[in-house]
Amino acid sequence: MTPAPTNTPTAAVPTMFGCVSHSPLIAIRPKAPPQEAEILAHCEAFRAQVEAFRPDRILFFTNNHFAGFHYANMPAYCVGTRAFAVPDLGGAAGEIPVPSADSIALIEHLRSEGFDPGISYRMSLYHAVSQPLVRLIGAIDRYPLIPLFISVFTPPLMRFQRSRLIGEAVGRWIAAGAAAGTRT
């Protein structure tokens, strides 16, 4: 996990960035590894930073182990306008509050920059989303969340350069929101 609150140079409002892996085994293994206390302490420290930051929304990049996207419909990347967490491998279940107008605005921004994300009006998210949300912000429904799915398992995969360019475009959208007073 790499929490890194940053003030973007062009933004009037600070933005915050965090990155965390997940482990489905943390909820279903018989014995805790010796590193678990340290990992959970980092999660608690990050949660305190998020609470102090008071985000208006969270943008969450995620992948999927075929819990919500399957071979029959596997977009390279997709933005959710409504999302639900499924209770697999110890993950939390329930509706995730997605600010659909913000999701649509992100899609429109990405399209204006030459990207064509898929759109999901009912995105199923799995433990890779719900476990980190519970550990890092306390619950899956604590803050509005925009899910952005990127396929990392099903060939043909996007080239790394394309993924980076999408990330930069998302960053510009976040910076524009920050300039307008939205904390992401």
State what each model feature region is.
Residues 1-2, 41-42, 127-131:
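Short amphipathic alpha-helical surface micro-motifs
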Residues 3-109, 113, 117:
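A short aromatic-anchored loop/beta-hairpin motif
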Residues 56-62, 148, 181-184:
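Beta-strand elements within well-structured catalytic alpha/beta cores of enzymes
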Residues 73-83, 133-137, 163-167:
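Short, surface-exposed, charged loop/turn segments at secondary-structure junctions
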Residues 104-106, 111-164:
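Internal, conserved structured core segments that host functional sites
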Residues 158-184:
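Active-site beta-strand/loop microenvironment that shapes enzyme catalytic pockets
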